[in-house]
Amino acid sequence: MKKNHLVKYLLISPSLPVGGFCYSEGLESYLKIKNLEEPDHIRNLITNELKIGQIRIEAKCLIEFFDIFVELKIANNINKNRRRLLSLDKWLLSFRDTVEIRDQQTQMAKSLFELTKEFGFEYLYEKNKNISWSLAWSWACFSFQINKLEMIENFIYAWTANQLSAAIRLIPMGSIKAQTIQLELLDLISEVSQEIVDSNINDLYVGNISLSMAQQNHNDLYTKLFRN
């Protein structure tokens, strides 16, 4: 694909339906429980998630999916790799503790698959299954020939921007402050991305379960955020 180094911006553009999602993934409940109301609290929360949170597992799975797509493209062990693809995706979705969170993932994945199909890259593997956002993102990057490091960096950047976008609606924080925090996190995003690329998936762990537990109250957030 021509100019594939620019195509990646389609995935994180807030002007597109895929980039326009603003789910907070339990952030509202977490802030309420912890009584966090300052922008610095949001920065610290995101920093902790990047260092020891679930986002690291999801990002690493991007590479695992990517490698499977490479194998499938060259028709290497097709049945085995398709089973591996489905198994890994089901395992990843199981990390999502509520129906709302899982629905969020599969809805976003469906939209991204529709986008890649418009570009001539229809997803052909288990496309009738509930599929995670991470798998869809990996498929898009594989199709657009985006390298693995950029894939991880863009994924984490987009996740961070999404959390900040949700935070603007939840606490007294303007968009300029949110952009400032995003800028301050760039070095960490780059560092974490390289670490994930270099790591083995079996060596990663989730050490911060607070945000995951807050997802248990996601239903209230789901209605409030979209009503606004």
Swiss-Prot record:
Keywords: Chaperone, Cytoplasm, Nickel insertion. Pfam families: UreF (PF01730). The keyword Chaperone applies. It is found in: Cytoplasm. One of its GO terms (cellular component) is cytoplasm. InterPro entries: UreF (IPR002639), UreF_sf (IPR038277). GO terms for molecular function: nickel cation binding. UreD, UreF and UreG form a complex that acts as a GTP-hydrolysis-dependent molecular chaperone, activating the urease apoprotein by helping to assemble the nickel containing metallocenter of UreC. The UreE protein probably delivers the nickel. Belongs to the UreF family. Required for maturation of urease via the functional incorporation of the urease nickel metallocenter. This is Urease accessory protein UreF. It comes from Prochlorococcus marinus subsp. pastoris (strain CCMP1986 / NIES-2087 / MED4).
